[in-house]
Amino acid sequence: MKSRMPASRLMPILHRLLGVVALLALLPLARAATTDLGAPGGSLRGQLLIAAPEMDDPRFVHAVILMVQHDQGGALGIIINRPVGEVTYADLLKAIGTTGSPVPGKLRIFAGGPVELNAGFVLHSTEYHRPETQQIDGKVAMTASPDVLRDIAEAKGPKKSLVAFGYAGWGPGQLESELMRHDWFTADEDPALVFDDDRGLVWKDAMNRRSQAL
């Protein structure tokens, strides 16, 4: 795993969040991803994708990915076990250009994948809802708005959350090919894993829960 990103590098990324968070609105999450893809189990939306122990791509060694999109047009997921740094809640409010009453403490930032490294994604528990909120599978949601970051900084946000920059993406048929090569296992999504405070054990725990050896 790469070394933690220093705050001096995190802050410029957070400053760009307002401009790039709109990327989420381009994701076709509103349409049902239920098409038979010709891969075992069909769509993996709402599932965990777990790197096989033999994974030789350094970007995905021991990666656990929450799949938020998977249909005939391709696939998109967020790596949930790559923490890269922390930012104080006060600095978070500054980064998104707002004022408020931040609580003490820091927010961990994750590397969500190697694509669009400046794109911000907020995964969170489902009791929190805004007009922009999209349900992934009824257990985890995603909100495309800096307002969720403000609410998190002021302890008014979701009970559980994960803020990541970047994502893992596959073109049409690409993920299916990797599945047939046995590069990945799958497991049912579990908020206890997605929001686990002990990131170092997520891959091992996910492997213990794997439901399908592809």
Where are each of the predicted segments found?
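N-terminal secretory signal peptides that target proteins for export/translocation
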Residues: 1-13
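A short aromatic-anchored loop/beta-hairpin motif
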Residues: 31-214
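Alpha-helical and His/Cys-centered functional microenvironments
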Residues: 8, 19, 74
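Intrinsic disorder/low-structure terminal segments
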Residues: 7-9, 23, 59, 194
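Bacterial N-terminal signal peptides
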Residues: 15-28
